[in-house]
Amino acid sequence: MPGEKDLCQYELWIIDIEKKTANRVPADKWTDQYIQVIQPGEKGDKLFFQRFKRTWDEVDICVVNTETLEVKELIHEVDKPYRDYHMQNTVILNDGKDILFRSERTGWGHYYHYDGEGRLKNVITSGPWVAGQVAAIDTVGRTIYLYGFGREKGVDPYYYMLYKASIDKEGVTLLTPENAQHGASFLSSKRYFVDTYSRVDMEPKIVLKNNQGKVIMELAKPDTRRLKELGWRAPERFTVKAADGLTDIYGIMWKPADFDSTKVYPIISNVYPGPFFEYVPT
């Protein structure tokens, strides 16, 4: 937190179990930096990691030779004013020959394809919307499946929508057009996935889809009749303008069980008051 004097210090060590040796990797660059391992190489001869500046607006993607401890900086990125840790994602493929890197360099979070030397090969996603977490990767078909936000008109921009994109060229295809929050679980072949989607005012639906987005079959659907018989009412979704008169703010409204439209009721505003975001599930 701001003002703290004693901060965690991160180090990276290479431990050889057979030789019974432990060596510290010379990965220091910034004071009070944060180090995170991405993954080892396929043969164990290298290790990919990322280091973040304390101000969380700069990041390096690096690789270290596990024998010589030589560190090579592959990608250096500056994201002002702040790098979104929850959305940041770096994927190493083909033993480091392909690197999928997420950046907000355009003002929107998107994915970029780099080679093993840190050279940009191509843009994967682009446009006035946000590419989020990776859901799955088909290494054979060189296809990435990812969540996106704010791309589809008329859909709450906070809803997770699933897209697929080629690793080697720009462009995405929407796989979940239903106006709801989606969660995808892929089968190992990546040919099919289970799509679970819902809203606060819509019961969950669970369907099996192919990797083209076609519904193969419905797997499960909850029975909410008893819940409604007991008097439960779904909340109402709404959108209002912020103080600037331009920005949409999305929320939900729970009305009393005995709501009377002819009466006046007090309003209780309930949001998460954290210093970094305010969020209401819709």
What are these regions (language model features)?
Residues 1-4, 15-35, 64-88, 114-140, ...:
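Multi-bladed beta-propeller domains
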Residues 2-6, 39-43, 48-55, 65, ...:
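Beta-strand C-termini and the immediately following turn/loop, strongest in propeller blades
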Residues 11-13, 60-62, 110-112, 161-163, ...:
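A short loop-to-beta-strand structural motif that recurs across blades of beta-propeller domains
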Residues 14, 24, 39, 48-49, ...:
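Structured core elements
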Residues 50, 174, 181-282:
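Serine-hydrolase catalytic core recognition
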Residues 8, 32-34, 57-58, 86, ...:
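Short, small/polar residue-rich loop motifs at catalytic or cofactor-binding pockets
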Residues 158-161, 282:
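Beta-propeller blade termini and top-face loops
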Residues 44, 57, 70, 86-87, ...:
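Extended, hydrophobic alpha-helical segments in both membrane/secreted and soluble proteins
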